[in-house]
Every structure is written in C-alpha cells, then in structure tokens.
Amino acid sequence: MKYKDLRDFIHSLEQRGELRRITQPVSPALEMTELCDRVLRAGGPALLFDAPDGYRFPVLGNLFGTPRRVALGMGVDADDNATLASLRDIGRLLSALKEPDPPKSLKDAGKLLSLAKAVWDMGPKTVSAPPCQEIVWEGDDVDLHKLPIQTCWPGDAGPLLTWGLTVTRGPNKTRQNLGIYRQQLIGRNKLIMRWLAHRGGALDFREFALKHPGQPYPVAVVLGADPATALGAVTPVPDTLSEYQFAGLLRGARTELAKCLTPGVDTLQVPARAEIVLEGFIHPQQGAPAPAPEGAPPRPTAGAAAGYEHALEGPYGDHTGYYNEQEWFPVFTVERITMRRDAIYHSTYTGKPPDEPAVLGVALNEVFVPLLQKQFSEITDFYLPPEGCSYRMAIVQMKKSYAGHAKRVMFGVWSFLRQFMYTKFIVVVDEDVNVRDWKEVIWAITTRVDPARDTVLVENTPIDYLDFASPVAGLGSKMGLDATNKWPGETQREWGRPIEMDAAVKARVDRLWTEIGLS
C-alpha cells in the first residue's frame, strides 16, 4: 500500500492495530520518552499522543518502532516473516540505480530502459496552494515553544527536535539534500543545527560559505513528512538520484513539493503535504562572539563556515546510551513556520539500544546487503547488530577463496559507504556461520581466531564524534577480526574438521522423535 502523506499512514496503521491513541495528558518532558521506550522494547505499536500536557499539537512517537512498520512505510505490505526479504528487494533497486549491470541481451537492455524511465517519471512536481502552508506564522508569531518538542532524558540540555528532515542545497548543485539532524531549542526562533562534518547538510553549508562568504545560508526543516520521504532521508540513495525521486519510486507516485515562502529560502522545496515546515537561515556572526564558557571546547575558527553564528550544543542522551560531550554547531534562525490545519508533531527519542534509530538500522541493514553484494560478490550476508549502536559493529559472512581474503573484505566494507565510515569493529565469518546468531559468531571467534594473526588494527581513522572511547574527538581506531577457516599460507597447522552427525542416523532419529514422544 502507498501513502500520500503522514495522515494516510497513521490511518492505515490504526486500522492494522499498529498504532495506539493516548488520550490521557502526557508531558513531552521525559514522560513521552518513558512510555515510548517501554512500548518499543515490547515490540508494541506507534503512539499518537492526542493531548500532550500543555500543548495543542498531537505528538506522534515510535512510528518506525518495528521493522514491519519500516517496510510498510516503504510501501511493502508484508507479514513479519517476509519483511526482511522485501527490504532486500528495495536494496536491489538501489543497487541497480547506483551501478546498473551492462545489458547482456535485448531483454536486459529493455529492463534497464524501463528502470531509467521509472526514475525519470518519478521526478518531483511543484504544486500551488499546498496543505503544508494552510497556516503561516510570521514575525512575532514565530515561537518554537508552542510546539511540543520533547525533552527526552533528565540530563538533557533542553528540548530537542529529533525527526526534522533538513532540506539544503549546495551552491553548485541542482539536487536538494535531505538529512535528519537533531536540533536543540535555544530560543523563540533559534535552534542549534547539529550536523556532523561528513553529512550532506554540513557539506552544502561549507561549500556555500566558501562561495558566498558573509551571506545567510537558507535552510528548511520538515516535520511530519510522508513515510516514503522520511525513510528516503535515511537511506543510502545514490548521488545521481534525489531523495524525493526515491520516495516517488517507493510510493509509486511523484513527490509533490511546495516552494518555501520566505524570500531567500524560496529556492528550497519541501513536501507539499508535510505537517509542519520551519523556514530560515544560518546567519553570519554579527560582532565579536561571546567567549566560550570555562571548560568548554574552543569555538571553531578554521574555514569559511566558522564566520557564522555558532552555539554550544548538548549534552544530550544519545543512541549510545550515554550523554554526549558539548560541541559547537551552527545556529538556525527560524523566520517563518508553516503548517497544515490540525498539524501533528512527529518526534522520537534516542537512548541505549533498542531505540527507534536501532530499529531503523535493523531494517536498513537488509537494504545494505544487496548494495554490498553488488560491489563484493563474495559477501553472502551482512549484519549490523542493534546492540552495537546501529553501525559500530558489523558481522560479515563471506565465501572465502584465498588466503587474506577476509582482510580484503574488511577494508572494502570500511571504505564502501559513508554509513560504514564509523564502523569500529568488523568480524568476518564463513558461510557456515549465521551472522544473526551471537552463539555461532562467538563460537567462530573462539575457535578460528588467533588474536595476533587474525586481528587487524587501523589507527587514526574517522570515528563518530559521539564516541567518547576514542582518544581524540572524531579520530580513533578500528579493529577487524578474521574468524574464517584458515587457508594454506595463513597457518602451518592441520586445520580442525567440524563435527557432523551421519545423515542416515539423523533421519532415523527424526522418525523416532515422534514415536518416543519428545515432540
């Protein structure tokens, strides 16, 4: 089933028993987090808080709290058993878009042309009088405190906007970038835009600051987009394809867009049926900035982007299960807020796995597999355990062909997608080991690994800024474990032969099993 907007998706989830309305008053400060966390850990439904304490906007939480709801959001109507396989089909689509196979026949050429036509046909279209601009706040009416922005954890620095799709464009690009970056509320119309240096929004901003120093940088933030667009923003879409086009492919209908209303931001387009849109700028720093608080990291001084307004962000509880350190990020000044009538505020929380980002990671893991297999045909399976904070550990299953092959795969994974830049640990196993079963993975590590021979350590590599275990923020080491059977040249000893029961005996016991009454 395809969904034209968030409300359509909510209605469908409610009919399926996948969404529960909460009519009792619940505070966005801590209480929603506790409720959502308990429900998510139990595999429960999405929650729509109809009466958030002190606010008039309903709050939607846990929307993608199960892999099945992620698949439904991508337009795949599958039962729980078929969900992961359906997500791999989406990965195959992305793989074909990223690197099409050369056609081997007229039939293959026809398929390639059909795919190209489908992508072309799904180019977004601009509409007039969009629902997302039914209500407009301008001037003194712009007040972010009117929105039920969650404060998720007791030690958080303040309310945090979490599910905003940030729309940016670089100075030399026609394609808009969609990214999800958390944003700390620091004033009536001020948010801190926490985008890490390698993310698309930060790259667009730096390029703009270099080409147009001292000019305000336009930004739009979308709250409550349709599920295909929201999930497109967290999917590794090829650079040649916009997230809006990919959302159209998932939805089976072109994404309808609206031009922003604010002069200077009207170069950006947002989903026409979004619930709430924030329009504004990152402004150049006016005058000398205030000195950094005692004990805080120094203000950024290098690069053209350093000349823009920055503020100290955090600390916040994060997907690691810890509060992160404070750091400087640009300030986003909101000039205008547009919304639908009876708008819904979409939110989430992050914390020790499992949380909603971890569930998204489990689902997107299946999208990654065909992409990896396209580049590395020897990879037979791939798993990012949610306990590893979504991406910090990867287990790779491969068909090994020569000595040293596992190490080649490690370095290939680390360098393939931006999403794997921050993967600290990679364990490589053979085809006989189920990468989703910790018992089998631990067995392979403890029986097939010599720590000195089979451990790869790489120093001074990019690492997640939130990883406080690294000695320097943003720079740390990586470790690979070769837990495959060793080939000649990798060991001088006779390798162990796995124990396996005789097939005829197993068949005999299968027949006896029921007779004995053990089943």
Curated annotation (Swiss-Prot):
Chain residues that bind Mn(2+): N177, E243
Statement: the UniProt record of this protein carries the keyword Signal: no
Chief place where the protein resides: membrane
Active site: D318 (proton donor)
EC class: lyase
Biological process annotations from GO: ubiquinone biosynthetic process
Keywords, sorted A to Z: Cell membrane, Decarboxylase, Flavoprotein, FMN, Lyase, Manganese, Membrane, Metal-binding, Ubiquinone biosynthesis
SUPFAM superfamilies documented for this protein: FMN-binding split barrel (SSF50475), UbiD C-terminal domain-like (SSF143968)
Cofactor(s) this protein cannot do without: prenylated FMN; Mn(2+)
Membrane topology type: Peripheral membrane protein
EC number: 4.1.1.98
Transmembrane segments: none
Summary of subunit composition and partner proteins: Homohexamer.
Family matches, as PANTHER family: 3-OCTAPRENYL-4-HYDROXYBENZOATE CARBOXY-LYASE-RELATED, FERULIC ACID DECARBOXYLASE 1
Function statement: Catalyzes the decarboxylation of 3-octaprenyl-4-hydroxy benzoate to 2-octaprenylphenol, an intermediate step in ubiquinone biosynthesis.
Protein name: 3-octaprenyl-4-hydroxybenzoate carboxy-lyase
Species the sequence originates in: Burkholderia thailandensis (strain ATCC 700388 / DSM 13276 / CCUG 48851 / CIP 106301 / E264)
